[in-house]
Amino acid sequence: MSRRRRGQAIHGWLAIDKPVGITSTDVVNRLRRTMDAAKVGHGGTLDPLASGVLPIAFGEATKTVSYVMDGTKVYHMVVGWGEARDTDDREGKVIDTSDVRPDAQAITAMLARFTGEIEQVPPIYSAVKVEGRRSYDLARADQAVELKSRKILIKDLTLLETSTPDFGHFRIVSGKGAYMRSLARDLALALGTVGHVVALRRLACGPFTAETAISLDMVDALGHDAPHSESLLPIEAALADIPAVPLTEAEARRLSQGQPVSLLHLASRTPLNGLAQGETVQALLNGKLVALAKIVEGEIRPLRVVNL
């Protein structure tokens, strides 16, 4: 009996503009079918309530997903004041109310407290694991959930407008692991009220931005031709913030075989200014990624080899 075909070997990234109402996994599964792709993953979960940039990795690009997930995110968030929800967004049940509506002056004065490195407790309806089980599974089973706080980084938090007393619009620039639902909840409490996320849109995720993201309908229209579209970005697109080191064919072959390359050989033909011990680099041959590597004791040692 013949083996079932597993799909095309597609390698690269698509920046998808995820619509409201579907999960990140829904997007992955839809693209796998539409593009007949053998291997697909995403670079940072967006809740069903949220829209915006969802980076999708194909094939060998999945080896670079962690670098996108560790990257900076930019959001536009609308907070509704006066109602706390069990999910910390508009899809949950109302669990508390308040008549307090903070004004722009009070909100602006509070923002510094939530900027920089802060402690944050994830929402109980989240994928955080508690003794091997997802927190949202425990919450849905009406089991008590107590999550530990964690350090997260809010690089910038700006009040854009207060269109009505019931809503505040914010622009947030965050590091990895920050929950916007928790930020809305905690900001409201600090302002003497309660609140939840009414709308959330991700404007950027690592190097991928809303300006270059494409819709699922556009991918559907391309179908199996999507891998040949200019929208499919190279694997290196996810690594814009990582220094690049050019290799010769012989050096590329060594790294591909799991062997280190001497920095002295590289330095003899190309400047390596600014590279530090322990730093991660992208090793390139003719502009194409060969491996992600680390500088250790005068050598470039492969971390993740790309097989194209």
UniProtKB/Swiss-Prot annotation:
Gene Ontology molecular-function annotations: RNA binding; tRNA pseudouridine(55) synthase activity
The protein's role, per its UniProt record: Responsible for synthesis of pseudouridine from uracil-55 in the psi GC loop of transfer RNAs.
Biological process annotations from GO: mRNA pseudouridine synthesis; tRNA pseudouridine synthesis
This enzyme's EC code(s): 5.4.99.25
Active-site residues (renumbered): 47 (nucleophile)
InterPro entries, A to Z: PsdUridine_synth_cat_dom_sf, PsdUridine_synth_N, tRNA_psdUridine_synth_TruB, TruB_C
Keywords: Isomerase, tRNA processing
Pfam family, one: TruB_C_2
Catalytic function, reaction form: uridine(55) in tRNA = pseudouridine(55) in tRNA
Highest rank taxon of the organism: Bacteria
Gene: truB
Protein's name according to its UniProt entry: tRNA pseudouridine synthase B
Protein family per UniProt: Belongs to the pseudouridine synthase TruB family. Type 1 subfamily.
